[in-house]
Structure formats: C-alpha cells, structure tokens
C-alpha cells in the first residue's frame, strides 16, 4: 500500500477546526466560498512568478516539499535562498487575510520549514507570512514551541485520517461563520442533536435513580 502523505495545507484546516479537517481530508467534501476563492486567486498570482536572483538572494516560487520523516507534503509559495555561506533557507507564505493571534498560519509555515530541513540537510530558524489584506510581512521564528505544536498537530491529524473518524463541531461557534463547509457540516443541527440526546440521557439516569 502506498504511504499517505498529509498535505501541509491540511494542518491549517485541523488547527482551525478538526471537523473541518476531517470533512475535507477524510470525507473528501469541499465547498468554495468567497474566502477560499479569494485565497486561491492570490496563490495563483504568486505561483505565476519565475525564479529570480537579487542582491545575493534567489527567489524560488511554488517549491514542492516533502518529508519522509513526518509524512507531509505540499507546495510552498516562495522560498528565499540566501546565497552567502552557510546558505540560509527562508520560507515565505502568502495569506489573503491579516495576522492572527492563533498559530494556524504559523503551523503551516513551520511544516514547510521541517520539509526544507529534511530536504536540504539544514536548520531553518525563521520564515515569514505576507498578509495581502494588511500588506504586512510577519517574521516568524521557527522555535521549539512552534515545532512542538506543529508536530502534535501532524500526528493527531494523521491519526484521524487513518481512523477515518470525523470529530464533532468546534465549540468556538465564531469560526463557523467564515467556514467554507458550513452548509455541508450543519454544525447547529449536529449540536442540537447532541443536546437532545444529552437531555434524554440525563432523564434516563434520573429514572434509574
Ligand atoms: S462549520 Fe464550524 S464545526 Fe463545521 S467544519 Fe466549519 S468550523 Fe468546523
């Protein structure tokens, strides 16, 4: 059987909502909304660029990545290769929105760094996320905390994928508002069903007592 490589983009789905991850990567459901369509257009624009070299830095676009160790694979938007010795590899990811408190985008960047380290036999100490909406570039240290968080997510997401299990909706209802899978997921109906069965179980317990 072929080894399954988890798409790096799936880690962001998992970090946002494990159910969203499972709907896309276990059940193969996908529904595009304004946010996903806009994000796709942005990546197509970034992907168009040819490699170029300026002031000791080579800029490589749409670089394919793979880690045999962590069983992840994907494509990164931009890799800066600083050509002085020792060479420095600096991943850059483009996002349509603005910087976030949560690590969703940083996890994706860290997974890219893990692949580069394995493929190039190097250590990646930092990368950057460029936010289209705010025209801001956030430098991200690839530190021990981010690495641990990213590796935890890789392992848990991989297990869910292997088990074919779809978790319940996130407790954080605000995330559902911008979720491209809201119509397919029907989180409110699922939550109501869960509340109904919970109440039934509660009264069943009282009858027994
Ligand atoms: S609608 Fe909410 S619970 Fe469902 S996948 Fe999206 S974020 Fe998760």
Residue spans for each PLM region:
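Metal-dependent nuclease catalytic cores that hydrolyze phosphodiester bonds in DNA/RNA
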Residues: 1-91, 95, 199-209
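Short amphipathic alpha-helical surface micro-motifs
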Residues: 3-6, 41-46, 61, 110-111, ...
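A diffuse structural propensity rather than consistent per-protein peaks
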Residues: 4-7, 102, 143, 164
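Non-catalytic, well-ordered alpha-helical scaffold segments
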Residues: 8-9, 76, 106-110, 173-177
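Mg2+/Mn2+-dependent nuclease catalytic core
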Residues: 55-156
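Metal-dependent nuclease catalytic regions and adjoining charged, substrate-binding loops involved
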Residues: 68-69, 118-209
């Amino acid at each position: 059987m072929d080894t399954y490589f988890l798409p790096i983009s799936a880690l962001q789905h998992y970090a946002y909502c494990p159910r969203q991850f499972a709907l896309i990567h276990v059940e193969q459901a996908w529904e595009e909304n304004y946010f996903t369509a806009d994000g796709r257009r942005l990546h197509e624009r970034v992907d168009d660029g040819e490699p170029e070299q300026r002031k000791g830095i080579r800029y490589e676009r749409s670089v394919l990545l793979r880690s045999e160790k962590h069983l992840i694979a994907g494509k990164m938007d931009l890799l800066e290769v600083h050509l002085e010795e020792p060479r420095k590899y600096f991943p850059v990811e483009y996002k349509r929105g603005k910087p976030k408190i949560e690590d969703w985008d940083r996890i994706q960047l860290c997974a890219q760094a893990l692949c580069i380290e394995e493929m190039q036999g190097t250590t990646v100490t930092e990368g950057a996320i460029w936010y289209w909406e705010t025209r801001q570039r956030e430098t991200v240290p690839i530190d021990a905390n981010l690495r641990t968080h990213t590796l935890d997510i890789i392992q848990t997401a991989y297990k869910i994928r292997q088990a074919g299990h779809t978790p319940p909706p996130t407790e954080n209802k605000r995330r559902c508002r911008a979720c491209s899978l809201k119509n397919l997921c029907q989180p409110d109906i699922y939550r109501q069903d869960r509340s109904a069965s919970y109440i039934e179980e509660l009264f069943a317990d009282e009858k027994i007592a």
